Amino acid sequence: MQKREILEKYKKEEERILVAKLLDKIELCEKRNKMEYTDFLDEYKESMLKKVLNLVKTDYICFGGYEEAERKLLIVYPEKLNQVFEENKFNFNTIISVIRINPLKEEIKNLNHRAYLGGLIKLGINREKIGDIIVHENGADIIILKEIEKFLYTNLCTLKRFKNSKIEVVKLENIINKKQEMQECKIIVSSLRVDNVISEICKTSRNKASENLLSERVFINGRIYVS
């Protein structure tokens, strides 16, 4: 299927741009006979691009730094690398890095996922360059593209919220991974308003549910819900 035919399937400009970028990377992969990869994708974008890859029949793998990652890179690669990826011999540390932030104990309680992400955005980092942010009892492990590692390592300490924190770069195999717990819920709601549904699922007030929405803690089909 030709590039133009594929792009015509997508009416939203954001989706067309994303698909076009992927198709460009596939062309580069074939032309240069070397792997190419996207920025970090949320679950919705990953699912959409996988459908494109099924149309063009290109070898690919999705990886976000650890097995349970929600945000992943999509890597397309030439036939010569089939064995490398099939036998898990590729060193992902060459394209993905992890910045560990260890704040002072008395400051940890004031830092949540949004605070860590906000710090990166304040430094001018594009969200797509950032993978999962794993918040743990000692701080956070932030998965990023290798290309921004040096900049973040040098500049994170210039932010007031991190000025007393220990900043270090760690390997993917040393990520402090908190296992996600999944729970299936069956609820009855008076309306399908999102805050109403969240309130019932979390057994909390509508106001608290609205706070979670504003804090970008709610995902629907892999995408942050924006009211």
Question: What residue spans do the PLM features occupy?
Answer:
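Ferredoxin-like alpha/beta domains used as RNA- or RNAP-binding modules
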Residues: M1-I201
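A basic, amphipathic helix-loop patch mediating RNA/tRNA/ribosome contacts
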Residues: I188-S227
